[in-house]
Every structure is written in structure tokens, then in C-alpha cells.
């Protein structure tokens, strides 16, 4: 006996007088889509790889048998809403070295982005930092199998290589990203501003949303093309014939994002992260990683140059290490030398008794 998505029950039976012990299934009948397996036929019988045998577990055959560890992260640790953040904690806990990957972008002979895109941030009190890079010669298509599998394992639906890259970077770094189709960025200008009376936007989910004055939007020279930190606009989405892309990696005011998401009834994974007040220093490595993946997947040419507008960056904080008070509060007897070692494992610098708090650590 088997159950298919949608409540379809498969049992032994007879079909045209012959015994039937099963059913040949299409992607759709298995609850899968062409986004997951782009080289299959959605409505036809799904032909599996030649090396599988009758009786093999379908999850193993299609690479859907990865082990997923679910962590419950408290709201005061947004730095752990990412693979890198969790790796840092795991490295410290198991006393293993943390291997950092520095994204490398080669650029191309396609020129510079500076004569193609202009960015203005009049709502600087709501946008701490706005970073953008451009990719031309884009070839939209399915992502490679390894990328689709990693996204699916994290509950993210694969869409296409460019959109998948932005989602993958968000999982790695905890930094939400967005990609705009440059064709639809009027006047080659991006403006981070507050919405005005009577403005509307149709978001990527197909819903027309009236905007209240004061909501933070990403606009071009004429109109809103995205809800900042929440969801992009349908009028600038990445489609099959997109050839030039603007990558956005920004840091928005968490309170503003939360209020807009609540007012519109539109909470997304991106808005949930921005509400926690992310580290503004993430925007550069995230956009660099996205461009590195573009080059690795050979799906476009990264233009030289990075637009990086910084309005507010938190000042470095320093704390005094007080071993006696810490042990009193925790009811422990941890030696001071061990405390310093624990902090250093967490990549928190300590000089004497002065702790320098990293920008990523709340």
C-alpha cells in the first residue's frame, strides 16, 4: 500500500483483468515539479536513472535522502541563522578549526557597472547599507543538481540558477539577497525610498498591494520594483529571457521591515531575518559570493565594480571580562584562562581582559 500526495491511495488490484501491484508515476503525481527535476516531463511517466533497480527507495534514487539537522535558534542570535554561523558555533564546541571561504570574483572584459547603474538612498535612516553588483550575458536555466538538492534539503524550492544563487547565499551567510532584471529598472536607477500616497506594487506572489506612505521600497526612476527586505516586484522579476541582472545585498532597518510586513500581511524568510537586525558587514561578502557562484556555474559575466552605500554602521563595542562575576552568575568555577580560550574559539578577540565584540555578534 502507498499514499501519493493529494491523498491518492495505491493498493493491489486488477487492471483490464491483469494483476496490478503498483503504478508508474509522473513528477506531478509524486508532488514534485520541473523546478526540482528540470529534465523530466512533468505530466509523463518519470524515467529514472539507468543504475537504479526495482525495489530501490525512491528517496535514495532521486537524492532526497540527505540528513537534515534542525536547530531551534533563539531570537537573540540572528548570527546563527546561517550555515556559517552554525559552523562557527560547532567549531568552538568541538574545538575544531573554522575554515573560512573568501569569495573570489574574477570579473570580465564586459566592462564596468558604474556607467550602467546609479543608486540613490534618500531614506538613509531606514537603510544602513546598500550594496549592488551587476551581471551581464546571463543564461537563465536550471541550477546544477547539487545546488537544487541543497536548497530542497533546506525547504527552499529551486526556481532557476540566478534566483537559486540568491537563496543559497542567504542560507550560507544569513544575508537576504534579491535579483532584478535590469531591463525593467527604468533610467538605470535604483532608489531606496519611502512609498508615497496612492502607490501600489504587484509582488512576486502575484498580489497587487496598495502601499501606505512611509513604507520602505526599492524603486527605479518611475515606480516601486520591490518591497525592501520583504519581496520583489513582479515588474522586475528574473524570467527565462533575462540577460542582465542587478544583485542587491542590503541592510535595512528591522523595525521598518517588521511594520511593513505586518501591515501587508506578508512575512517572508527575508523579512524574518531583517527583523532581527542583521550585521551590515555581511552585504559585501554575500554579494561577492553570489557573483562567485555565477562564474562557477558559467551563467553570466560579472561586471567590474561594486556600488556600496554606507549610511550607518554600528561602532565597535568593547566589554570588560569579569571572571568572578561570571562565575557568580552562572554558579560555576571556570578559570579565567578557559574563559579567554572559549571566546577565542568563537572568534571573539580578547586582549588582557578587554573583549572586542565582532560586528556579527549581537
PLM segments and residue spans:
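RNA/tRNA-interacting regions in translation and RNA-turnover enzymes
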Residues: 1-362
Amino acid at each position: 500500500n502507498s499514499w501519493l500526495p493529494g491523498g491518492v491511495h495505491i493498493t493491489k488490484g486488477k487492471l483490464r483483468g491483469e494483476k496490478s501491484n503498483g503504478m508508474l508515476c509522473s513528477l506531478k503525481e509524486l508532488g514534485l515539479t520541473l523546478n526540482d527535476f528540470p529534465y523530466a516531463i512533468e505530466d509523463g511517466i518519470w524515467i529514472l536513472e539507468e543504475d537504479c533497480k526495482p525495489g530501490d527507495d525512491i528517496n535514495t534514487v532521486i537524492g532526497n535522502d540527505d540528513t537534515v539537522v534542525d536547530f531551534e535558534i533563539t531570537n537573540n542570535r540572528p548570527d546563527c541563522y546561517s550555515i556559517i554561523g552554525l559552523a562557527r558555533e560547532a567549531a568552538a564546541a568541538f574545538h575544531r578549526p573554522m575554515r573560512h571561504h573568501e569569495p573570489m570574483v574574477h570579473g570580465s572584459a564586459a566592462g564596468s557597472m558604474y556607467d550602467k547603474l546609479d543608486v540613490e538612498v534618500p531614506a538613509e535612516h531606514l537603510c544602513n547599507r546598500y550594496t549592488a553588483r551587476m551581471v551581464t550575458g546571463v543564461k537563465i536555466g536550471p541550477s546544477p543538481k547539487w545546488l537544487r538538492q541543497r536548497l530542497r534539503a533546506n525547504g527552499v524550492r529551486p526556481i532557476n540558477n540566478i534566483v537559486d544563487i540568491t537563496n543559497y547565499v542567504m542560507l550560507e551567510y544569513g544575508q537576504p539577497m534579491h535579483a532584478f532584471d535590469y531591463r525593467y529598472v527604468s533610467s538605470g536607477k535604483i532608489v531606496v525610498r519611502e512609498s508615497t500616497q496612492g502607490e501600489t506594487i504587484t509582488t512576486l506572489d502575484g498580489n497587487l498591494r496598495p502601499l501606505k506612505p512611509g513604507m520602505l521600497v526599492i524603486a527605479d526612476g518611475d515606480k516601486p520594483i520591490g518591497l525592501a527586505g520583504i519581496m520583489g516586484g513582479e515588474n522586475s522579476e528574473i524570467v527565462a529571457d533575462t540577460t542582465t541582472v542587478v544583485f542587491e545585498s542590503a541592510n535595512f532597518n528591522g523595525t521598518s521591515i517588521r511594520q511593513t510586513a505586518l501591515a501587508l500581511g506578508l512575512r517572508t524568510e527575508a523579512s524574518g531575518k531583517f527583523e532581527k537586525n542583521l550585521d551590515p558587514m555581511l552585504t559585501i561578502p554575500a554579494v561577492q559570493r553570489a557573483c562567485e557562484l555565477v562564474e562557477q556555474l558559467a551563467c553570466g559575466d560579472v561586471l567590474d565594480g561594486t556600488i556600496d552605500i554606507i549610511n550607518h554602521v554600528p561602532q565597535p563595542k568593547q566589554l570588560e571580562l569579569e571572571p568572578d562575576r561570571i562565575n557568580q552568575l552562572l554558579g560555576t568555577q571556570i578559570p579565567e584562562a578557559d574563559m579567554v580560550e572559549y571566546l577565542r574559539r568563537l572568534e571573539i578577540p580578547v586582549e588582557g581582559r578587554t573583549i572586542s565584540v565582532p560586528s556579527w555578534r549581537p
